[in-house]
Design a protein with these regions (language model features):
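Membrane-embedded alpha-helical bundles of multi-pass transporters/translocases
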Residues: 4-573
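Intrinsically disordered, low-complexity cytosolic terminal tails
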Residues: 572-590
Length: 590
């Protein structure tokens, strides 16, 4: 006991001593921990609230009130498989260079972005379907539920407008605000007002009164604008990269970041409870979206921004004025050498077997227990708490187990949980409370046993960027999604399997059919079986190919530090006027 008291006293002594200035070897003073708590807590809460609004089956507003056909979402996603590559190329080039491009390159970017923005506006204001032959127009009118020839062009217009204008706007914002706000904070500041405004429009506009074909494209336009003004997740990125010190970074993400979930948990409790008390439909009632959601958006945004300005970004990087310009092919060559990105992409491809699966918490709470009020709130909080002990112990667990071991263990747990889900639906599916209790226990235990992995994954993503710098001279974070070019089309096609099988089981766009035991049981067993197959296959790449150990990372960091020291010794050499320019053919920084 005396020993434990001594540790507590030593901790509080350190807090007082290093309140404003961190100890040697560390970077984050304890005072900043409070700011991280508030900023990340507000950000997590906003992400929770944003989760209620999505152009997909998981959105109550879209599913219950707009009744968009299930296959409409999949059809729209397939429209843009090819064009997504163009936007990926452009955005990766901008992100990798932080928006600071040579003048000639910048003019080309602006020409492409603004051309598509103008084309999108024309498609939205004029009926392009009038130029189609009657046969083609008739085919478009009858091919997809909820989409006709007019709506087809409007959907493309919304897509082109938001991607074109969003790309142009992104370059301008970076050039104006990046030096002042940092690479992660700038979009949180510049998007919040527009993002919340569009969210309120989605909640308030009476689009459900429109014909289905008009309703679909107007909803799609609103959600494209909503995505263009994304304002969440940026604060988390600051916290994930808060310190070059590995253990300090893990500590920050295990304690102040994890404890900040308290803010979200309060909203998790209040929102469904108030909705259940005020509105007949509870959390899924339309008035919840009209009145409660906007109010919680505003309060959460205020909480985040009060603390956000007090957090510092500590990413080792040269001054913007001295930053090299890296061409597309230089970045591609560097990314293709990173074997760990390939392994993660292979795992993601295998994980797509479960794409289209219904949310287990929704099925458990609404369609099995049939709760939307107080019990819904309490159950959600308990399930979210399941991962807390593991995440608080993450630094201790990560010290003692390699990342490979944690990944394999996690997939074993997920596979076991899927087996329990199948047993619950197969044998207890019509006994609602017994089935729900078994689902609840399996969900809780699964999250509890795998929770430490979430923090370990965030840390590993940073280590993979360290490895990228080790092999190519730059982190190329904006290009790390390029391997998705190869896996993305396959993922989209695989994602059609479960929705098509749901249709054969009797579930299309009417979610009320999930209250029917036979339909719900059949749909859940189908989806979980695909999930189970994915979890088993996801173990294999880590077992046979992953060799990024902690010891290897230590050696990489030593080499990176040695390179930084050598470059530091060269800073006194005569320099020409700094300008953004093409790198040497090797792709190395100078």
């Amino acid at each position: 006991m005396a020993k434990e008291n001594g540790k507590v006293k030593a901790f509080f002594h350190d807090v007082r001593t290093y309140w404003k200035t961190p100890p040697e070897g560390k970077y984050v003073p304890y005072r900043e921990y409070l700011s991280i708590f508030g900023a990340v807590g507000g950000d997590y809460t906003l992400q929770y609230l944003c989760g209620f609004l999505s152009f997909g089956t998981g959105c109550y507003l879209v599913a219950f009130y707009y009744q968009i056909p299930l296959l409409t979402f999949a059809a729209i996603n397939t429209f843009f498989i090819a064009t997504n590559y163009l936007w990926s190329i452009l955005s990766m080039g901008v992100d990798a260079n932080l928006g600071f491009l040579p003048k000639k390159v910048e003019r080309k970017y602006f020409a492409i972005y603004l051309s598509f923005a103008v084309l999108g506006l024309l498609m939205l204001f004029f009926d392009f379907s009038a130029f189609l032959p009657d046969g083609v127009r008739l085919a478009l009118d009858s091919k997809w539920a909820g989409i006709d020839a007019v709506g087809f062009f409007k959907i493309f217009g919304a897509y082109f407008l938001c991607n074109g204008w969003g790309g142009f706007r992104g370059i301008v914002i970076r050039k104006l605000l990046l030096k002042k706000l940092g690479r992660y904070k700038l979009f949180a500041y510049s998007n919040i007002v527009q993002g919340v405004t569009v969210a309120v429009l989605i909640c308030w506009l009476p689009l459900y009164e429109l014909p289905m074909t008009e309703r679909v494209w107007k909803l799609f336009l609103l959600f494209q604008l909503y995505g263009m003004f994304a304002f969440t997740g940026h604060t988390q990125k600051v916290a994930f990269n808060i310190s070059p010190n590995q253990q300090e970074r893990l500590f920050v993400n295990s304690y102040p970041v994890k404890l900040s979930h308290i803010v979200q948990n309060i909203v998790n409790f209040l929102l469904p409870t108030i909705a259940g008390a005020l509105f007949v439909g509870g959390i899924s009632d339309r008035d919840t979206f009209r009145y409660l959601l906007p109010a919680f958006f505003v309060v959460s945004a205020i909480i985040m921004f009060i603390s956000l300005g007090k957090i510092k970004e500590r990413i080792p990087a040269p001054p913007i004025e001295k930053k090299e310009y890296y061409s597309f092919w230089t970045c591609i060559a560097g990314i293709f050498k990173n074997r760990y990105l390939w392994i993660n992409s292979a795992v993601g491809l295998l994980d797509s077997l479960g794409n289209g699966m219904l949310n287990m918490k929704t099925i458990l709470l609404i369609y099995t227990w049939r709760e939307t009020g107080l019990l819904f709130s309490v159950a959600e909080i308990v399930l979210k708490f399941a991962g807390t002990p593991g995440q608080l112990l993450a630094p201790w667990i990560r010290k003692r187990f390699q990342y490979k071991t944690l990944m394999v263990f996690s997939q074993i747990v997920n596979a076991g949980r899927s087996v329990i889900y199948i047993v619950a639906f197969l044998f207890l599916g019509k006994l609602h409370w017994l089935c729900g209790i078994l689902l609840f226990i399996a969900y809780f235990l699964g999250d509890g046993l795998t929770s430490a992995l979430k923090i370990a994954q965030n840390d590993m993503n940073i280590r993979i960027s360290d490895y990228q710098m080790y092999i190519s001279g730059e982190r190329f974070e904006g290009y790390q999604g390029i391997i998705g070019w190869f896996t993305g089309p396959i993922t989209s096609l695989v994602g059609l399997i479960i929705p098509l099988m749901f249709v054969s089981a009797g579930f299309t766009s009417d979610w009320d059919v999930l209250y029917m035991d036979d339909v719900r049981i059949k749909c859940m067993i189908i989806g979980i079986a695909f999930d189970l197959a994915g979890y088993i296959l996801m173990m294999l790449p880590y077992i046979f190919f992953w060799d990024y150990t902690d010891e290897k990372h230590v050696e990489i960091m030593k080499e990176l530090q040695a390179r930084a020291d050598r470059l530091g010794e060269e800073t006194n050499a005569p320099q020409q006027d700094a300008q953004i320019k093409e790198p040497a053919p090797t792709g190395e920084t100078t």
